[in-house]
Design a protein with these regions (language model features):
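Polytopic transmembrane helical bundles with strong interfacial aromatic enrichment
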Residues: 1-157
């Protein structure tokens, strides 16, 4: 999908996008990616089980829990800004809506996973899958915003 976005011509805009949007979408990609890596580390090392039981690997779990705040706030900001521009730029609004829906689903599944202490494996896998979908959506959004915001380079004739 990202390759297809890169090959398509940039979408036309009635108004330019805010100058800060490419940087903000990039920050969202980086924070969600970092959070996904921490989540993968928690799952692969069974850090939650070891922390709840033997009080080992608690630092890994705590870093993942602390990372929820910045990743959620940046993704929420990107989704909200994109959704608010829906009348001017419909594709941006649709992607913003997808980000917000996936973010709400991710937080809900994450809370349920934590409350059940990662004992329900399909729920843990769903948490990882929704995180990957959120990351992919943010990557596509970032690519489109960056391509759309590029100013044409003046040529000397």
């Amino acid at each position: 999908l990202t390759l297809a976005v890169g090959l398509l011509p940039p979408p036309a805009l009635a108004q330019p996008l805010p100058r800060y949007l490419p940087g903000l979408t990039g920050a969202a990609v980086l924070t969600v990616y970092g959070q996904s890596l921490l989540g993968g580390l928690v799952a692969s090392r069974w850090a939650a089980h070891q922390c709840f039981g033997a009080r080992e690997l608690c630092q890994v779990l705590h870093w993942h829990l602390l990372g929820v705040v910045p990743a959620t706030l940046v993704a929420l900001a990107v989704g909200t800004i994109a959704l608010r521009r829906q009348r001017i730029t419909p594709w941006l609004g649709r992607l913003g809506q997808a980000v917000l829906i996936l973010l709400a689903l991710q937080v809900g599944v994450g809370v349920a996973t934590y409350q059940l202490r990662l004992q329900v494996e399909p729920l843990t896998v769903t948490h990882q899958a929704v995180g990957a979908l959120l990351l992919g959506t943010l990557v596509v959004l970032t690519g489109l915003v960056r391509r759309t915001n590029r100013q044409p380079v003046p040529t000397i004739t």
